[in-house]
Amino acid sequence: GDLVHCDFGITYLTLNTDCQELAYVLKPNETKAPKYLEDALIEGNEVQDIMTGLFEKGKTGNEILSETLRIGKEKGYKPQIYTHPLGTYGHSAGTTIGMWDSQGGVPFNGDFPMNYNTVYAIELNTKVFIEEWNKEIRVMLEEAGTFEETGFRYVNGRQTKLILIGDQRVHLGN
């Protein structure tokens, strides 16, 4: 079995999406992904929860970045955050929360405060050591989310299970 990462975006009516999800290619006779990969995805989801739980009107992207990294590391994770606004281009105007090459803060865009009624690509990864493969992998996730007065929510939900490739039962509806 292999772990597959897909990063894609769609532009429609001048608005952009940005999404990353993970899939697992089943070995012959497998019907589900190995537990160690399911657990790795759970760690990625927990990092998402840490970060989005820190969203607060007026808090800057750099403050959210710093707190997310601190809390994530305290919990034993190896997070990397690079969340950005979505809009009429992929990395749109507004509050930026980290960049892949700027985990100590983002000058200017990271200093913008969070505002309600804004949409973000919740983009991040966490590194997880997989004993069975004797290597570290990055659980890379990205989903659209909106920050409103009622709090944060994912626009269309988020990935919480690996997509299974080669599972004919799912494909055929059995």
Predicted segments — roles?
Residues D2-N174:
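Active-site neighborhoods and metal-handling regions in enzymes and metal-associated proteins
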